[in-house]
């Protein structure tokens, strides 16, 4: 029997232990996609308490708490910070088998150094007190934690109308060495069926100083804002393709679709597909021209609980996995981009693990000469961001492509404590390769496999995104 969460956690072969401790453990973090608030980094935010840094805004924890029968007031409601933390602590022992149990205790270990206590109802007060004491120290501010965790690059998620002033503040401070760059997330300009689409287009036009009445105007406004993002170091875009669609249309048709929508009309299913396709094709050309990486997050079924959506809004833990068809529309979209000026570097993520092999084989259709791993099958995302999910994703990538060219892990998180997910990923990666060696499926060549692990942990991403650190 192995003790829980030792220095060799998940490393069940000698080769895995060598890979992790000699090649993976000390690698810096290149967190190319996250949802950290840039304002907190700019002001070097000092967290009020453990709830503020750990539970606030964490829909993973809220889902577990609701499943445990916890009242909503202790998740998103009016209970005090200490009461909410207590409700979480009471839930934690019930999360064994869920990645939250591992994440929770990895996060207590790093950066707080708590290795002697498991979180529960009876230990909550002790952990609350110890962590709050540390959070008052300079090394536990937003920037302090990023420094402790050796984070070299962070890609935030930003709307085209954002002024990016916080990124300017960060970039102007030479004492802070972590690169914090915006990522372009234009979903609100793309989701023509959304209730607030027309209102958003007015805001976009105002910020870009473009009167948007035709499709070409929308493209011009987006170009203006992409120039603004590029001036702030942006090299990455991200799209939530909850359902992948494809439909072709000429300019006159697109103008009509947009005009009717801005006049209060409701677009039909075909019109939505035509409009979204046109936006993605235009943006794909721009990304290619600018040398940006595009990311497609595919397959979320959002806002399933109408009463809770109306009460609390989006992104509060009522989303799940979609099962809409992916292969044909995605193939047509990527092929059209290839024909329409060339396909830029692309990372595809799927929320439904049913689609792993779809994406794993799809990327092989569009790889590019002179660019190793131009098309990427992204790391296990959201509900797949756990041991089995990451093992499946990496195994299928290895079987269908080149694991050695994988750009590795990202937190996709709103929490400054989530950097231990990189550690979790690295341990799982080393466990998997170590088992291959133990079973005679890979050579016991520590230099070869150690270099591969090092590349996946950091160097591949650094090269792929071409961001100077």
From Swiss-Prot:
Catalytic activity: D-glucuronate = D-fructuronate; aldehydo-D-galacturonate = keto-D-tagaturonate
Keyword Isomerase part of the UniProt annotation: yes
Keywords, ordered alphabetically: Isomerase
Superkingdom as given in the UniProt entry: Bacteria
Record carries keyword Nucleus: no
Single GO BP term: D-galacturonate catabolic process
Name of a matching Pfam family: UxaC
Pathway the protein takes part in: Carbohydrate metabolism; pentose and glucuronate interconversion
EC number: 5.3.1.12
EC main group: isomerase
A GO MF label: glucuronate isomerase activity
Family to which this protein belongs: Belongs to the metallo-dependent hydrolases superfamily. Uronate isomerase family.
Database matches in HAMAP family: UxaC
Protein name, UniProt field: Uronate isomerase
Record organism: Edwardsiella ictaluri (strain 93-146)
């Amino acid at each position: 029997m192995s003790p829980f969460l030792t220095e060799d956690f998940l490393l069940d072969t000698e080769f895995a232990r060598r890979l992790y401790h000699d090649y993976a453990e000390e690698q810096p973090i290149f967190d190319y996609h996250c949802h950290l608030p840039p304002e907190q980094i700019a002001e070097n935010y000092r967290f009020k308490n453990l709830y503020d840094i750990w539970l606030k805004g964490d829909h993973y924890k809220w889902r577990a708490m609701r499943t445990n029968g916890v009242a909503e007031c202790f998740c998103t409601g009016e209970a005090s910070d200490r009461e909410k933390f207590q409700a979480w602590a009471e839930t934690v022992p019930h999360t064994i088998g869920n990645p939250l149990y591992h994440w929770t205790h990895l996060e207590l270990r790093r950066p707080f150094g708590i290795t002697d206590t498991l979180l529960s109802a009876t230990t909550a007060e002790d952990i609350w007190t110890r962590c709050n004491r540390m959070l008052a120290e300079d090394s536990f501010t937003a920037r302090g934690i990023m420094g402790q965790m050796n984070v070299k690059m962070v890609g935030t998620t930003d709307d085209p109308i954002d002024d990016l002033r916080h990124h300017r503040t960060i970039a102007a401070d030479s004492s802070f060495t972590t690169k914090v760059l915006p990522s372009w997330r234009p979903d609100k300009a793309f989701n023509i069926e959304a209730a607030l689409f027309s209102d958003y287009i007015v805001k976009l036009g105002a910020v870009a100083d473009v009167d948007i009445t035709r499709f070409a105007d929308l493209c011009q406004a987006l170009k203006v804002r992409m120039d603004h993002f590029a001036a702030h170091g942006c090299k990455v875009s991200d799209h939530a393709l909850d359902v992948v669609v494809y439909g072709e249309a000429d300019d006159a048709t697109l103008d009509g679709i947009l005009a009717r929508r801005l006049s209060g009309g409701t677009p039909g299913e075909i019109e939505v597909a035509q409009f979204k396709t046109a936006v993605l094709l235009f943006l794909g050309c721009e990304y290619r021209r600018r040398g940006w990486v595009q990311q497609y997050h595919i397959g979320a079924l959002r806002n399933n609980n109408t009463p809770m959506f109306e009460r609390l809004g989006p992104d509060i833990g009522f989303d799940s996995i979609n099962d809409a068809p992916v292969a044909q529309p995605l193939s047509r979209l990527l092929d059209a981009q290839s024909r329409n000026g060339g396909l830029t570097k692309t990372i595809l993520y799927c929320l439904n693990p049913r689609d792993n092999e779809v994406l794993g084989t799809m990327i092989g259709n569009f790889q590019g000469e002179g660019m190793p791993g131009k098309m990427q099958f992204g790391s296990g995302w959201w509900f797949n961001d756990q041991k089995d999910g990451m093992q499946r994703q990496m195994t299928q990538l290895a079987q269908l492509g080149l694991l050695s060219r994988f750009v590795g892990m990202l937190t996709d998180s709103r929490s400054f404590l989530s950097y231990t997910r990189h550690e979790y990923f690295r341990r799982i990666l080393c466990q998997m390769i170590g088992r291959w060696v133990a079973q005679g499926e890979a050579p016991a060549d520590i230099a070869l496999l150690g270099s591969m692990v090092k590349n996946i942990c950091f160097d591949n991403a650094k090269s792929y995104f071409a961001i100077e650190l």
